Structure formats: C-alpha cells, structure tokens
Amino acid sequence: MHNRKRKTVKKTVSFSDDQNLTNANLNNHRKGHIDDDTPPVYVRKSWTLIPFHLLALLYWFLKYTDFNLLALLYIMIPTQVIYLIFRFNKNTIYGKKRLRLNWLLVFITLGACLLLSIPCLAIIVLFGAPFVELLKESWLLALHCCFLTYPAVYDVFNCNFKVGYFKKYFISVVIGCWISCFVIPLDWDRDWQAWPVPLIVGAYLGSFIGFSIGGYI
C-alpha cells in the first residue's frame, strides 16, 4: 500500500472576534499594504479656497498705506483667522471625516506663528537680509511670512503633525519671496523697491497661488 502524504494546512491564530476583520487584514497583507500609501489628510479641490482677501490687502497696501508693513500685518492676521474658520478648515479632510474647529488651537497657532518668526528671521538674515540697520523691517517680513502660512500651521497641529502634505503652502511663500528679490537691485529709485516691500508682495502672491491650487497638487 502506498502511503499517501497528508496535506499540511496552514493555521492562523487571531485574537479578534470579528472573522471578517481578520480576513481583511490578511488580504491587506497579501496586497502589500497598499492602503497605507494613501494620504490620511488632504484639502478638497474647491474654488472657495482661493484667498481673495490677500489680493485685496495687497492692493490696499500698495495703493493707500505708503507701504506701512505694520498696518498690513494688523489687518492680515484677523483675515487669515477668518479664512481658516470659514474656508480652509471646512475643506480639510482627515481620514474620512471633516475636522471640527478647535478654538483653543486657533489661539495657540497664533502664538506658534509668532514664535516661528524668530527662526524665520534667522534664515532671512542668513540669506543676506540686513540685520543691524533694518532689523525691524526684516522681522516684519518674517512675521508676514509666518502668518501667511497660519492656516497650514493650524492644520499641521490639528492633523497629528502631517507636515509632508502641508509643506507646499510654506514652499509657495518662500518661492514668492525668492522670485521678488530681483527688483531690489534695479536702478529705478522707486519707493516700493525699499527693503522688504518687494519680498512682502512676493510672499502674498506666493501664498495666494499656494492656497488656490494647493488642493490640486
């Protein structure tokens, strides 16, 4: 008589009461955890995210304020908070749900942006900004850059520090500043060429573009 070889049966041990959940976990393991690659946080594609208020502020700054950086900052900060509450937060999805507004975090993020202006100032100075004679102007530039990214900073805190997704909003401000630098050395002798007015304009335009198309990138 021929000895028949018994087929070995692979046994799995599960501590879950839900057999369907166990099967789903096995399927995910076989697929190589494809679901892990999907981003847990994203911003919806919507025209309501276009920050028209930044263009309005920029027009007012260039037309009527005699390039008053402090006055522009005082108005920009509350408008950014309003933009976060009624636009950016409502279009931010974390996992499969829309995030509720965390009022405490709204105010904490304001303080965080203020603190972030210090390392931002250091970076600006390292890239050649005047430090001694125009320190106030350089710090105002750092403050504008940090508060322009205020909605993104809030979502970084509110979404478990998912910096990777929101870094594009910071990069857009940096690129705007960098591109606008070319007008400063031009021999035009215009008031708007004074430090750091061109970089402020570039930062606002970069932020406008970044928040407008951020959901599509």
From Swiss-Prot:
UniProt main location, coarse: endoplasmic reticulum
Subcellular compartments: Endoplasmic reticulum membrane
Record keyword Membrane present: yes
S-S bridge residues: none
Pfam (any one): PIG-F
Gene Ontology BP, a term: GPI anchor biosynthetic process
Membrane topology: Multi-pass membrane protein
Family (UniProt): Belongs to the PIGF family.
Function: Acts in the GPI biosynthetic pathway between GlcNAc-PI synthesis and GPI transfer to protein.
Name of the protein in question: Glycosylphosphatidylinositol anchor biosynthesis protein 11
